[in-house]
Amino acid sequence: MIEVLRAVGIVPVVKINRAAPAAGLARALCEGGLPAVEITFRTPAAADAIREACAAAPEAFVCAGTVLTAQQAEQAVAAGAKAIVSPGINMEVVDWCLAQGVPVIPGCATPSEIEACMRKGLRLVKLFPAEVLGGVRMLKALAGPYAGVSFMATGGISPANVGDYLRQKNIVCCGGSWIVPEAALDAGDFDAIRRLAAEARAIVDSI
């Protein structure tokens, strides 16, 4: 999983209101050079959207995001999600994923939370909310004591700062919501999403 995410570099983070556009979304992201997406459990459509995305673009690394309960994790995996991402550490979710052999990326905001994940054998965690926590400065501070831990940074990431994040040795990838504007998704404007994905891909390739 880590190498797949490292190759993608930027994972689009998506709130989807209806499952219907998920197929076109997944194809547009792949065509734009970002074969990954984090579909968040912020709406009731999440599980069905994951199912549609996986069916339309089996080559895409489809994650479930904002997973707050083990039940949501189970729904996501049943729909085809390849990994579970959460904004914080819910050990119920972590333990369920580990028992099922499902990759899980819990959110961490403190050294203590990072160490809690390390005790579970996890070496990739989500730094969230990244910019509020200090962003690149925070990552540099964590690199010394936690040399064996890598991060997915999400929260406040934009085209203006994502390059600075990706240059950090302890960053695997960043999550970004700007690639899939809600208005474009609701309107089915996949050309706009494809273009934004290609622009993000160009940033990754320039690092």
Where are these regions (language model features)?
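Glycine-rich beta-to-alpha transition loops that act as phosphate-gripper elements at the mouths
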Residues: 15-17, 64-70, 86-90, 106-111, ...
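Conserved beta-strand positions in the central sheet of alpha/beta enzyme cores
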Residues: 38, 63, 85, 105, ...
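Shared catalytic-loop signature of beta/alpha-barrel
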Residues: 116, 132, 137-152
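Conserved N-terminal beta1-alpha1 strand-loop-helix module at the mouth
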Residues: 1-82, 99, 148, 159-160, ...
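Glycine-rich beta-alpha junction loops
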Residues: 156-161, 178-180
